[in-house]
Each structure stands twice: as structure tokens, then as C-alpha cells.
């Protein structure tokens, strides 16, 4: 071991003291005490000895040039201005083997790799626990490898605190295997406040292997291929990690690669592609399962990248077998793409919290790529865009608003108790379910009616049990003789049929037939046939345009029968109907009178014509009998 000479500064070392004796006394590596720090002199031995002293080592001002250093201890502090510069153009630089506690802080680590393809890591934590790496600046970064890497060595890295990391990469090339920070299989660790510029494939922070129970937060990636990257190289992928606060400034591909891992929570991601040359612009790509990606805001995509080339934009992309993932996104850009479900992705749910410039997620230029994966089965992907009123897909194959139970109060419901679907346009509603499905409609007082499809027939309920049925060849009531077509207050204006109506005349449906009595015919003989105009038609068209009709007056027929002591209401030819006021409730709960109370007489002409025919028969018969009684 070389002997240190006494420094020129006031005595701390003694002449003839060895380096280790000095370090044991002081543990200070600086220009006056053995390390040159002039960017030229090889300070490898001094730095290595300082680390191996197991004491805290301070790197003072200067550039300390050294070859690769391998130590079991990590206790270096640079006071903010110290620089460790790699003398070698290849290989790893600072390697710490299974350090237990310790720190690397307030220092710049300079790489001097020979080419853009030279392999090597700047700082390596090979295993270890409870180590802090803080306020470290990585400069002159190029080649392949990582600025800071933590990986297993007998056991995975545990309890690392990595914060305040800056790195700037030169020699960018797409998919070059390089990145700023890599935590391979680390557990229970914190990576916070990372600023990375121009890093290729693995971006600012990569979690890899069995990495779990880590927090990655407050990461800025400028012009990186990706910003945070969950390793997808092998079958084992990170799980149970929290990644939050990601700023992606013009990434070259995807801002966040959630990878093949599971149960990771990724939140608060801001992505801008305004000046990016990316041909593929993705906010988040997901390949694993049971991950939550919350609050992704993406901007700067208009369909063309900074080089004028066509750019495909997708804020959430589900790859391969992505399953059971959730994402909430804000696509604040004009490019059409929003969501991609690749073949094989299942049960993923995307909530579009605001659609940006889009008014439809299923337009002709569909913003959902892979919409065929939304099939309404238990494996269906689902997209909700509440601002657009679009709820696309269901994993249950149905849409439900379900409550445990419902009981109606004795009084009417208030407006707050109602469920309404309002709109100026057409409303389409499809409900599926076996051979029968129905929609039930409620009024504010609890009355309900249903519209149903049963065995291919459409049914409109008229009461709790009654209905009108529209079948393939007929419109029928639920039972015979229970409904009328029109009413006294709402009569049909007319009608058209190809054949006359068929009226039931089966003897099995009638009482014992009786002959029409002379008293009835005598009363009927006093009812005159007249011509008339309807008053509402005169009011609408004028007396000169309203048409004339032929018939009888119901009240005159009633009076004629009364003169003969007969109650005409006992007979089916005379009708009398009355009704109360009819109100309609609008969307605000206000009642509006639509039909005032009233009454109206009516005539069944087929029956009075039978009376007229019977009267004529009697008259003719009597004339024939009178003629027959005349002398021959």
C-alpha cells in the first residue's frame, strides 16, 4: 500500500500514515487527501478504499476519474458538486454487492462509453436492502444498459429509496435496450422524482421480473420511447405496484407500458404528443390482468406526427390476453382513435370521463378499434362514455338498475322518486331474455304497464293482467269482448278494410232468440232518417265544405221509445258514454288538462238497420195480408 504524504493544509494526517490508517481516522476523499479529482488522474484506488472502509465517504468538488469499482458498501455523498467519471469506455462502472443500508447521494455519475452500442450499467445495486440513492445526476449517457439498475443477488433488492434522479441520454434509437432506472424484482421500494430525457426502449423507470409492492411516483419523461415500463420480456411480470404522477412529454411510442403484470395501480398520467415523431401514439398499453389505470389525459394528436406522417392514436390499448383491467381516460385530441381492444382481450372496462372532441364512440370512423370484442357475453369488453350517453357492452349480457326492494308510499310519488329518460329524438331500447322480455313503465302514482315480447308477439298491457297483442297475422285482445276500438271522447275518424267485419253470431254465444216485438217496431217507426253535418267539421272546413252525412239522431230515437214506454238504454243500438277530466303530467310534474269531462250519445247502425229491415218486413207482410183479404 502506498504511503500518503502529509497534506499542505493544517495537519490532520501524519507522515508515513497509510491510506487505510488515514481513512480510518478521517474517511474523507478530496484533493488534499489523496484523490486528485482533476478528471485525469486515476482515483480508482482511493475511492475503492474509501468505500471499503465502511465509513461515510464525502466526494468534494472535482471530477474523480476511476475505472469500474466493485464494493459491498455504499456510502458516497458528493455535496452536490462532485463528479465520478468512468475511465473505461466499456462495462459496468459502480457496482454495489448486497449493501445493507447506505446511500449514494448528491453526486454526478458520468458515463464515457465508446459507442452507441456499448453495454454497461452506470450504477448497479446487486441485491441489498435499505439503500438510499438520492439526488444523482447521470451525464453523458449512451450505449445499452441502465443509468441505475437494481437486481437480485441471492435475494431481491428490498427497501430501496431512489429519489431525485436526473438522466439525459445521447444517441437515441428506437428499441435500443437502455433506460434510466430499472428495478428488477425489487420489493418494498420507493422510486420518486425522476426526470429522464431522450431514453430509448425502457424509458425513465422500468419495473421488471417479480417487482412488487413498490411505489413509482412523480416521473417526467421528455422525448423518451416510453416513460414508465413494466417489463414484458418474460412470462414473469411486475405485480402489486403503485405508479402515480407520470408526465410524458412527446414520447416516441407509449407513455406507460403496463405490461403483462397484474394488480398494478397506475394513476394520474399526462401525455402530450404535440411535437412527437411517433407513428404509434398510445397513452397506456396493457397486456396483463386486474390492473387499474386511473386518470389518463392525452393531448397533441391530430392524426399526423411532427414529420407529417400518418399517426395512429389510442389513449388505452389492450393487447393480446389483457383481461379484467379498468381504465379511465380523457382523450383530449382530435385524432379519431380512443380505445383499442386487440383480439384475445376480454373483460376490460374503459370509462371515457370526457370524450374530448368526439360526439360518438361508434361513428363511421370508429374510435373503438376492435369493437367486435364487445359482444355482450361474460367475456365482453365494455366502454362507458356518460357525457355522450353511451354505454357500450355488458359483461352480464344485460343492463340493470337494480335495488334490493321497492315499496310505493300510499300517496303519489314526488318528482325526486321518478326515473326519466327524456329526449327530442327517437328512443331505441332493446331488452333480451329467453322467449319473453319486457319493459315496465311507471307513472308517478305507482301505476305500471308493460310492453313485452312474448313468443314472437308484442303485447301492450292494459291492466295488471290484460293486454293487446300484435301478432304476425292479427291484433287481438287478451280475451273476447273486453275492448273497444276508440272511445266516445276519442273516436276514430274513419277506417279502411278489404272485407267487412265479422261479428260473432254463434248460437252457442247467445240466449234463446226472441222475435222482435211489435211494440219495438212501432217505436222504431217514429224514428226518422235525416241528413246532417258534423259541427267540428263545419268549424274546421266551413259549412260549404263540410260533407253531408245520413243517419238518425240518437236523442230522437230515445224519445220515440220513451213515448211507447220503452227504455231505449236496454237495447244495444243506443249508446251513452261519459268521462271525467283527463290530465297529462309533463316532465316537471305539472298536470295539464287534455280532455275535459263530458258525455256523448252514439248509435250502432248495424242494429238500427236490422230494426228498419224488420219494420219493412212487417209492413210488407201486413200489406200482403191486406191484399190477400180483398175480395177476388
Curated annotation (Swiss-Prot):
User: Annotated Gene Ontology MF terms?
Assistant: lyase activity
UniProt enzyme class: lyase
Could you tell me which residue ranges the Peptidase S74 domain spans? 505-630
Q: What is the effect of changing residue 226 to A?
A: No effect on enzymatic activity
GO biological process annotation, one example: symbiont entry into host cell via disruption of host cell envelope
Per the UniProt entry, the Enzyme Commission number(s) are: 4.-.-.-
Q: Name one GO cellular component term.
A: virus tail, fiber
Q: Give the InterPro entries listed for this entry.
A: Pectin_lyas_fold, Pectin_lyase_fold/virulence, S74_ICA, WH-like_DNA-bd_sf
Site feature location: Cleavage: 505-506
PROSITE patterns recorded: ICA
Q: Name one Pfam family in it.
A: Peptidase_S74
Q: Which CDD domains match?
A: Peptidase_S74_CIMCD (cd10144)
Give the UniProt keywords, A-Z.
Degradation of host capsule during virus entry, Degradation of host cell envelope components during virus entry, Lyase, Viral tail fiber protein, Viral tail protein, Virion, Virus entry into host cell
Q: What is this protein called?
A: Tail spike protein
Q: Which gene encodes it?
A: kflA
